[in-house]
Amino acid sequence: MNTTLTDSQLDRWNQTGYIKLPEFLSEAETQNLREWVEEISAWPADDEKWMHHFEQTPSGVRPARTEYILAFHAGIRQLLTQGKIPDCAGALMGEPAILYKEKINYKYPGGGGYAAHQDAPAYEFIRNHITCSIAVDAATPENGCLFFTPELHQRGLLHLDKNGCIDREYADTLDWEPVPMQPGDALFFSSYAPHKSPPNETQQPRRTLYLTYNALAEGDLREEYYADKRRSFAQVDTTGGEKLKISKIGHFDGKPAQQT
């Protein structure tokens, strides 16, 4: 697609805090991404390299997320650091963008959802940041697409609870709009835009690539972010499944698990 954003798209972005761009990836790019995600999901656990996270589902322990991928996959590295994805992120931010973090959320059948939250509390090292999701599979309300409350992204952090999420009582008062996606669609959203997603209640996966970009002027802080994240995870007592973490905030509503 033409990645030049129109005035109406920019107006919608400024008003709502998010914008969906259908067919952002070409059919060939979408197929490549699907194959890459299949490859990455089959990588063996290696805590010195990429970071796999797992969850308990009705079908057993399945991958929930893989992150810190860039150095280990040339195709993913090129897609995320060159061309239309960082260019579009920069256009929406109003200045050049650089990748801050990357992850694949698999959300296999029975996979857990995510409580209402904003991404910003998890990003201590940056001020100007934006998230992009790319659909690998179709995302629907039934399999756990994202839901947003528009027009709240300029109010800063909203009623945070002890887990770094939006307080559930406050979240229940908001009007949530689903944003279904087709493979290859892109969804850009402010890290202050409140969003959530339900569990996957279908028999098909809802795999999505999530990317966060920060302003290049703030520096390349990706390695610093992941070093800090690894340190924080290393401090978690992993003797009980309920204490495992897949994120620096407690928004995951599934059941983190050790790989079996």
Swiss-Prot record:
Record's keyword terms, sorted: Dioxygenase, Iron, Metal-binding, Oxidoreductase
Keyword set includes Nucleus: no
GO molecular function: 2-oxoglutarate-dependent dioxygenase activity; iron ion binding
UniProt-annotated binding residues for 2-oxoglutarate: 107
Catalytic activity: methylphosphonate + 2-oxoglutarate + O2 = hydroxymethylphosphonate + succinate + CO2
Cofactor: Fe(2+)
Top EC category: oxidoreductase
The keyword Cell membrane appears for this protein: no
Binding site for Fe cation: 117, 119, 195
Domain of life: Bacteria
E.C. designation(s): 1.14.11.71
Sequence intervals crossing the membrane: none
Co-factor binding details: Binds 1 Fe(2+) ion.
Xref: InterPro entries: Phytyl_CoA_dOase-like
Purpose: Part of an oxidative pathway for utilization of methylphosphonic acid as a phosphate source. Catalyzes the conversion of methylphosphonic acid to hydroxymethylphosphonic acid. Is specific for the hydroxylation of methylphosphonate.
Family the entry assigns: Belongs to the PhyH family.
Protein name: Methylphosphonate hydroxylase
Species per Swiss-Prot/TrEMBL record: Gimesia maris (strain ATCC 29201 / DSM 8797 / 534-30)
